[in-house]
Amino acid sequence: KVLYNGTDSIRRGEFTFTFAVPRDINYAPGTGLMNFSAINENHTLMAQGHEEGFGIDGSETVYNDSIGPSIYAYLNTPSFVDGGEVNCTPYFFAQITDKDGINASGNGIGHDMQLTIDGKLTQTYVLNDNFRYDFGSYTSGSTGYSLPELSEGHHTLQFRAWDILNNPSTVTLHFKVVKGLAPEIYS
């Protein structure tokens, strides 16, 4: 299971990074595997490597603030307003931050980043694999998802994410699908 998939800089041939491990992983003694890859600024040199000779056992005691991550979510463009009109296949985007770290591993029952449309289990999607940490950070990142074609009319979307201390947050977006509406393009 992937615990962290992030990016950072190499400085003078060396690198360092920090990440937080979700509270609900299996803490049985064992070994882990780290895969590394690098590319220079000009995209002309690449390097790869791995390390599997390290142990995993136990964790540091951390104060739990009992507050879930902050989530800023929208459909198609940051100018989206809750209750606004969208095309039949809108793009969902969420920026997530938490000072303790974001759980993007999905370890633990029910701790996935999950998007649900109209409260239907058949329209529930796990977005863990779509999540990308911001460069050099384990406390912020984003995820996105192209929603399947939706019927015209009013819909509701709920998105839930967790921090590494098992505190969830949920955001709800209300929107109206208008057939033939061209999506607003945002890059």
Place the predicted regions along the sequence by residue:
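Long, low-complexity serine/threonine/glycine- and acidic-rich segments characteristic of extracellular
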Residues: 1-59, 72-83, 87-89, 93-180
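Proline-enriched interdomain boundary motifs that mark the N-terminal boundary
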Residues: 64-75, 182-187
